[in-house]
From Swiss-Prot:
GO terms for molecular function: endonuclease activity; nucleic acid binding; RNA nuclease activity. Disulfide bonds join 26-84, 40-95, 58-110, 65-72. The active site is at 12 (proton acceptor), 119 (proton donor). It holds the Pfam family RnaseA. It is found in: Secreted. This is Brain ribonuclease. The gene is BRN. Transmembrane segments: none annotated.
């Protein structure tokens, strides 16, 4: 059986290439990477960066995954990615996709030993606030009270 890490590489890694100027990129890649077998996968993202730099995200900014799990990580810098989104006219087995190339921060879920990406959780134009560095609650209120007492 395909491991979660291998599945991540198959579905999301396309290092050393780019979709720029190729509106057919998603149609070709979604088929080539077996995401149109049995059904059309509605949305998928390919990352055009080295596997090492995507693996490194697992030691970058820890954030909560969309499903509430705590093992997601956001990249410290933007990455060259391609979003593939099924078009309205797409009908299995003739899956059709719109190709959009972007520079965004990516979020991946990581697990295992070695700790590697196993799920692509999303991408954003603006970085998130990491989990541990959220401000401690009530701190500003305490300071305000202390400031008042000294008057």
């Amino acid at each position: 059986k395909e491991s979660a890490a291998a599945k991540f590489r198959r579905q999301h890694m396309d290092a050393g290439s780019s979709s720029s100027g190729n509106s057919n990129y998603c149609n070709q890649m979604m088929k080539r990477r077996r995401m149109t077998h049995g059904r059309c996968k509605p949305v998928n993202t390919f990352v055009h960066e080295s596997l090492d730099s995507v693996k490194a995200v697992c030691s970058q900014k820890n954030i909560t995954c969309k499903n509430g799990q705590p093992n997601c990580y956001q990249s410290n810098s933007t990455m060259n990615i391609t979003d593939c989104r099924e078009t309205g006219s797409s009908k299995y087995p003739n899956c059709a996709y719109k190709t959009s190339q972007k520079q965004k921060y990516i979020t991946v879920a990581c697990e295992g030993n070695p700790y590697v990406p196993v799920h692509f959780d999303g991408s954003v134009f603006l970085p998130a606030t990491p989990l541990p560095s959220l401000p401690a609650p009530h701190k500003h209120r305490l300071l305000w009270l202390e400031g008042n007492n000294s008057s």
